[in-house]
Regions:
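Export/targeting segments at the very N-terminus of extracytoplasmic proteins
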Residues: 2-61
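A near-ubiquitous, low-amplitude feature marking generic local secondary-structure context
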Residues: 33-37, 63, 93, 99-100
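Conserved helix-loop-beta core of C-type lectin(-like) domains
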Residues: 47-55, 60-81
Length: 149
């Protein structure tokens, strides 16, 4: 980064509203948080599955947003979709199953993200709604995701 670009970056970070920046949660911290929220064994999945899912959906970034071709968007560390689970005011045909505004899934507190992800997993009886989990985690040795934590 050029030296001239650093002050601009600092100014942009300073004017961004608190809670909207998102953070990268370190892997072992995420493991602890997920265990505290009862995800070990929830719908038959291990915490390692949830950590793998978060790694491949958002790279552990609580502020991640992905825009989809159908006009919906995916939000937060678990990339929760606006068509089915959260309200963003723009997605056509949305059902808002978690009854939460999508912006709440972008802050540094992932308690509401976990609550919504648990609802999704409970309704699906597993993690199959997440493409990244199906493609990168299902049926694989996921011990490295929790090793040392």
């Amino acid at each position: 980064m050029k030296l001239l670009g650093l002050p601009l970056l600092l100014v942009l970070l300073a004017v961004t509203p608190p809670g909207c920046q998102g953070i990268i949660i370190p892997r072992c911290q995420l493991v602890r948080i997920l265990r505290q929220h009862g995800l070990e064994g929830f719908v038959g999945e291990r915490v390692a599955d949830w950590v793998c899912l978060a790694k491949h959906e958002s790279s552990y970034n609580t502020g991640a947003i992905n825009r989809n071709k159908d006009g919906s968007s995916d939000y937060g560390i678990f990339q929760i979709n606006s068509k089915y689970w959260c309200y963003n005011g723009r997605t056509p045909g949305a059902s808002h199953g978690c009854r939460i505004h999508c912006s709440k899934l972008l802050d540094n507190n992932i308690t509401d993200d976990i609550k919504c992800a648990k609802l999704i997993a409970q309704r699906a009886r597993g993690l199959t709604p997440w493409v990244a989990w199906r493609n990168h985690c299902r049926g694989k040795d996921l011990r490295p995701y929790v090793k040392g934590c």
